């Protein structure tokens, strides 16, 4: 995903750590020895109003089974999956962090694909969608209002809309996943932490600034996913704090404090998108000494 010929000095360190990166189309890694097979595909990297990239969402997978987190704001989720080489039929589990439209509405399209595929005899699998009570209630209401009776009859049968509570565990992709309330003041929102290998965990803090209640999940994460609305140097322009968001500086200081091995920044503005990787890395390196990743849409990381 990163072309060394275009890399500037300020983010060449990312090239050094390119062992973590795989092309988005690489779906069949070699099963060698005790290598960790888990991969992370970033389907979208932008905030709610971006037009030059897709809204923030991503997928985790081992082999051909996928766990998708959020769906962005529309049917572009179908294009992102297609461009990433992921079939919607391979996504067996979804988690929706909260009800904001840039995270939720893509899930309605996924529901349509599953239910319509079942109604037409084109999909024989099952899918589980997790979320807190507000998300699950809203998805049920929207499905009843927007989908046909032939489609909605599969909800509760082969399409499971399952509520999770703060601190609850589920087994997803064969691994323990713990969901937690980030105590948002805007809209109820959950994050999660996955123990994907012995001594390895990935933690998603949602799309708002870290709250101290998340420490027991986020501390010492192998991979930490955190929002960064904009550069700290451009905070006056983008006003992240008024929107209850972080800057690159804030997120990197946090990751340093939490001793995260790798930090992925997402949910960004798109006005700097042509130089985002360079500019965000340059600012972040001043505050975080671990492996800093500023993904573009469709980049894939081997965990």
Short names for language-model regions:
Residues 209-298:
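Cap/insert and terminal regions of metallo-dependent hydrolase folds
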